[in-house]
Amino acid sequence: HTRALVNKAFSRPVIAKYEELIRELASEILDKAFEEEEFDAVERIARQLPMRMLARIIGVPDADSDWLVAKGDELIANTDPNYTDFVVDQVDTNEFRLMPFRSPAGKDLFEYADKHLSRIRERGEEENILSMILQPTKEGTVMIESDSQNFFCLLVAAGNDTARYSIASSIK
């Protein structure tokens, strides 16, 4: 049932609507990076672009983008003390056993998702990827709250991991 809810939101016509927004964001990030004579392209471009783009297409306020990037790092790099204070193989993770990646970042993202998704449901008129996913299918199927929170975390994890490393590996 989840696939039917997600397919429409990530269809080519829907994503095409974000092309200009994505171009503007990419230009903004590149312009800021190129202000410096030298910079770490992975940090300044590959780390920033996917999460900031994701934030915009799912309706997360720009003011929360830095937080989302940091939580994405904590979630995915949960074995690296450079990215998280909660290194999973060095601490008791039982408290977070039901959270993505057994991480407190998963809990933080669940709580954020709950508030963000509630705002989207209350407003009802927003046009973004998450608002589309929250809409019932033709058959009346809706994504339940826990699935919505998990999906939000999945988007953060995928945006932070797959897209970042794809961009990083393409930079020469």
Feature-to-residue mapping (PLM):
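Cytochrome P450
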Residues: 1-4, 15-24, 35-52, 60-67, 88-111
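Hydrophobic mid-domain F-helix/FG-region of cytochrome P450s
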Residues: 4-5, 26-64, 72-81, 114-117
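Amphipathic, well-packed alpha-helical segments that form the structural scaffold of globular domains
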Residues: 3, 7, 11, 23-31, ...
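Secondary-structure capping and boundary motifs in well-ordered enzyme cores
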Residues: 18, 42-47, 105, 140, ...
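Cytochrome P450 catalytic core segment centered on helix I
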Residues: 29, 70-141
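Amphipathic alpha-helical interaction segments
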Residues: 21-24, 48-53, 67-70, 128, ...
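Cytochrome P450 catalytic-core helices
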Residues: 130, 147-156, 160-172
